[in-house]
Each structure stands twice: as C-alpha cells, then as structure tokens.
Amino acid sequence: MGKNVVVLGTQWGDEGKGKIVDLLTEHATAVVRYQGGHNAGHTLVIDGEKTVLHLIPSGVLREGVQCLIGNGVVVAPDALLREIVKLEEKGIPVRERLRISPSCPLILSYHVALDQAREKARGEFKIGTTGRGIGPAYEDKVARRGLRIGDLFHRERFAAKLGELLDYHNFVLVNYYKEPAIDFQKTLDECMEYADMLKPLMLDVTAALHEMRRDGKDIMFEGAQGSLLDIDHGTYPYVTSSNTTAGGIATGSGFGPMYLDYILGITKAYTTRVGSGPFPTELFDDVGAFLAKRGHEFGATTGRARRCGWFDAVILRRAIEINSISGLCLTKLDVLDGLETINICVGYENEEGAVIDAPTDADSYLGLRPVYEQMPGWSESTLGAKTLEELPAAARAYIKRVEELVGAPIDIISTGPDRNETIVLRHPFG
C-alpha cells in the first residue's frame, strides 16, 4: 500500500520546501507540481552544490524518481527549456524523468508584457509580482480563452487562437498601457519551435497518478509559494494567482483529496515575505538585519531581499486549519543561534486593545499590533544537528512552545541547507 504525501508552505513562501521535497523523495516514485509557474524558486543543496529549480519538481535530482507537472501549473516554454538544458549540463537526464500535462496553460510573451506593464502602472501600490506573466496566464485560463500546451501540436488551430488573443491583449497594451504591441508571426514561430521540443514530454498526468496509486506507489505533491499567498485564503490582493493550499492538489492534478495520506506544512523558525503586503511581525531593527544576513534571505527567483520578522503563530494556526496539516517541518532553526531572546507572536491587538484572530484580507491588517511572548534564546550552534538531543535546551523549549501554540506536531527540523542537516522525528512516508 503506497502513501501519498503533500509538502507545502504555510507562510508567505520561501520556507525551504525544496530541500525537504528532495530529502523525502528517497521514498517516492513520483513528485508532482500542481500549481504556480516559474515564479517559484526551490533551492536544493546536495553535498555543498546548490541547484535552484523553478518549474521542474525537486525530485529531478533523484535517480529513478518521475517528475510530473500537473494541469494546474502555468508553463512558460522558454523558461522550462532553459531549466532543462541547465540541468542536463550538470549530467541530469531531465527528459527521461520529466512528463507534463498537455492541459497546462501556456505563459507567452504577451502575458509577461501585461504583467510588467501593470506593475509599472501601479507605482507605489504594486503587488510585487515576479513580472513573469503568471497572473495574466491564469486570467486567460479562467476567462476560457487561454492557450494550453496541447494546442501547440495543432498549428492552424493554434495560430487562429493566438491571433485572436493578440488582438485582444495588444489593444490593452498599446491603448491603455502605452506599451509596444507583441508581434504575431514572431510569437507563432517561437511557439512552433517549442512544440517540437515539448511533444515527447507529454503525458496524461492524472491517469498516470491513478495508475501509480492503484499499483501501491508512493507519490509526493510539491507545493509552490506559501499558504498565505493563496488566491482565496491569502492576504488578498497581495497574493499569487493560484491555490497554494492543499485544495489545489485536486484541481491542479486530478488527484482527489481522499487519496492523500499526510500533509506536511513547512514553516521557518521565523517569518519572511517578499514584495508588498501585510506583515505584522516585520522587524526594521538590527534583529531583522541579523535574520536576513544569517538566513541569506534573498529570493531564489528574483534575487529580491526578503522582509524578515518574528515567528507568527497566528498565521500558522490558520494555515494548519485550511490545509488540514498532519505535521510540521520547522526550517532554518540554526538562523536563530546567538539571539539572546526570541519573540513569538501569539495574537494581534487592534487600536482598542482587543486581541483578534487572523484577518482574511490585507486591509483588515491595518492598525493591528503583534502580541508577543518572549522566550530565552541560545548561544550554542544548532547547525547540522541530526538528533533532538543535540539541540540546546532553549532550542528544544522553543520547538515545544511552537507546537503548543499552533496545535500541530513538529515532525521534521531542518538545521542547515544540506539534505543531511535534518532531524526526522516522524517520517511522512513511515
């Protein structure tokens, strides 16, 4: 009997999912991406060598693991092919391991142009997108006008749809945003080149997943971004354009929720956020700078500096509920080494002094102040610890208090960037 495990982020992304997926794929037959696009950036460190993945599932570095991209992922063919070539230059046989649903929506040049034009027009009110066309591609999908990978293999039909789409989007680009139009013939020629390279990678991912399930294989689902960036449950409108929570698995891969056995929520031992939007525990002092420097807090996709703050138990409790989390993985514990005291946000206080629960949209965060519980820090190093007993008593107390506050067990603790720098208390595939 196989197990089907989900790994997803519980904060605003950048929680360290890539390392944990790579660690757990030792037990998996397949790793599946089910939402997002190449706005994700998953960093893996194996024997000191760093690899950053954007579209391809993190299981690609494991021999014998099949990597699947489900229908919920928006695919930029140029970005995908660049990533494939980069990995192949390292000797990784990507094309043997990777298969893609033909139902994936395409991200094309006009999506990127629209994304960047909108952010530019918003000025100081920009959302902080990666500018890679993710949102506009999902818009086309929901409006039922988008092109999908499967359309690439029918030239005449594709050309007709592309012409209609460009008429529509170029009108907005030129007349509203005062940006140059996207050329039809250039776009069509590029897409036909992509078609030849992508055709061998096509697979009915949904059917393949259910065949594996019936055969008792272990399957892992890899989330991108974090729960608080979910289009429905995140800090709207400062969110991404897909469902980053566990519900996105069913829609983004065709694998029903009753088949899932364990949902692992990844959370940092502190909190970070990239781009605009509410962040109640954000630090603007020396501690914030310390966390950013020690944690190397720069986006794997954009290179942008991440905002840093104290651990927020309020948002984690919400993420645990909306994802039905089975257990947590606490990452970057070692970044807290050397801090004299550590704060945990246990609630929010409004201007009247009343303590309230997590708001449901960005505007509702205005005027809220974090309520902190202070804990002693530790001077000893936790870097590379492989057992709970190796951790300082204060670090163990911090872990226990987090569990108590959020109501979920911490089953895995990451104590460094390498896959071996990990404490596994309960294995998701166990």
Curated annotation (Swiss-Prot):
Q: Where is the signal peptide?
A: none
- The UniProt annotation places Mg(2+) binding at D14, G41
Task: Supply the enzyme class, top level.
Answer: ligase
Its keywords, alphabetically, are: Cytoplasm, GTP-binding, Ligase, Magnesium, Metal-binding, Nucleotide-binding, Purine biosynthesis
Protein's UniProt keywords contain GTP-binding? yes
Indicate where this protein is primarily found.
Answer: cytoplasm
* SMART domains xref list: Adenylsucc_synt
* Family named by the database record: Belongs to the adenylosuccinate synthetase family.
Q: Which residues form the active site?
A: D14, H42
Q: Which organism is it from?
A: Pseudomonas syringae pv. syringae (strain B728a)
Superkingdom of origin organism: Bacteria
Q: Which residues bind IMP?
A: D14, E15, G16, K17, N39, A40, G41, H42, T130, R144, Q225, T240, R304
Gene Ontology molecular function, alphabetical: adenylosuccinate synthase activity; GTP binding; magnesium ion binding
Q: Which cofactor does it need?
A: Mg(2+)
> Could you tell me the EC number(s) of this protein?
6.3.4.4
**Quaternary state and interactors:** Homodimer.
Gene3D superfamilies in the record, alphabetically? Adenylosuccinate Synthetase, subunit A, domain 1 (3.40.440.10), Adenylosuccinate Synthetase, subunit A, domain 2 (1.10.300.10), Adenylosuccinate Synthetase, subunit A, domain 3 (3.90.170.10)
Identification of the protein by name: Adenylosuccinate synthetase
> A Gene Ontology biological process annotation?
IMP metabolic process
The transmembrane segments are: none
**Protein location:** Cytoplasm
Q: In which pathway does it act?
A: Purine metabolism; AMP biosynthesis via de novo pathway; AMP from IMP: step 1/2
